[in-house]
Regions:
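Bacterial N-terminal signal peptides
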Residues: 7-16
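Intrinsic-disorder/low-complexity, polar/charged segments enriched in Ser/Thr/Lys/Arg/Asp/Glu/Gln
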Residues: 47-49, 60-66, 76-78, 116, ...
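N-terminal, polar/Ser/Thr-rich
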Residues: 18-62, 154-159, 179
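Extended, low-hydrophobicity, Ser/Thr/Pro/Gly-biased non-transmembrane segments
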Residues: 134-223
Length: 223
């Protein structure tokens, strides 16, 4: 019986491709979020408190983020957070009311996912602690859209809004930027007195325009 070499070669190529695809599938972990630098199987954020100033002239948010962390793996010795184009002023670990500076460094940047922020957990730290991160965003933040007055409906005041999907929250808050965990949050936002800040959280809709606004989200939401 005559066998066509071309058909045989084609069959071998198909088998090789199938074998390669099986290897890829075997390595895939459906419980892992491949779009975050953080490892939520080792340590998780439970609460986020923001205190931020809005600077329209600089197109910048500045202040601090306070993250309440819970260590899942007792052996883990660092926290890895997602960032993109953030300037970090300082990092501190707070435990039982005591604050101490923390060692930190940026990892290698990625054009799509930003830059991991590695924070060392000192030996002797318990499984629950807070991270205080003083930081500022940049005008290049992919989550923040800054509009001059002429581009707003009223034409008198500037406006800024955030759009964090899909991986852009890390460009205005250093955090575990993943829906794999849920957190509660609160925020204090300071703006020019003529402007009003709003967030998807509990707040007073009749609050006077003082330039300082407070928000609370008691329901855990995707980080």
């Amino acid at each position: 019986m005559h066998r066509n070499p071309a058909i045989l070669l084609f069959a071998l190529v198909i088998l090789a491709a199938c074998s390669k695809n099986e290897a890829v599938v075997d390595d895939y972990d459906p419980a892992r979020d491949y779009f975050t630098f953080s490892d939520t199987s080792a340590i998780v954020t439970e609460h986020l408190a923001l205190d931020l100033n809005v600077d329209f002239e600089a197109s910048e948010l500045s202040g601090f983020a306070l993250l309440s962390m819970r260590r899942v793996d007792p052996a883990v010795d660092e926290v890895v957070l997602d960032t993109r184009d953030l300037s970090i002023g300082s990092v501190a670990i707070i435990e039982d009311g005591n604050s101490a500076p923390a060692e930190y460094r940026f990892g290698d940047p990625d054009a799509v996912f930003g830059t991991p922020l590695h924070i060392v957990i000192p030996a002797g730290t318990g499984d629950r602690f807070d991270l205080m991160i003083v930081y500022a965003t940049s005008p290049q933040s992919t989550a923040l859209q800054w509009l001059p007055p002429e581009l707003t409906a009223g034409g008198k005041h500037p406006m800024v809004f955030s759009q964090s999907q899909a991986v852009h929250a890390r460009s205005w808050v250093p955090l575990q930027d993943t829906p794999a965990i849920r957190i509660t949050y609160e925020a204090t936002i300071r703006t020019p007195e003529s402007l009003l800040a709003v967030m998807s959280a509990n707040n007073d809709p009749l609050a006077p325009r003082t330039g300082e606004y407070h928000f609370v989200m008691p329901q855990p939401i995707p980080s």
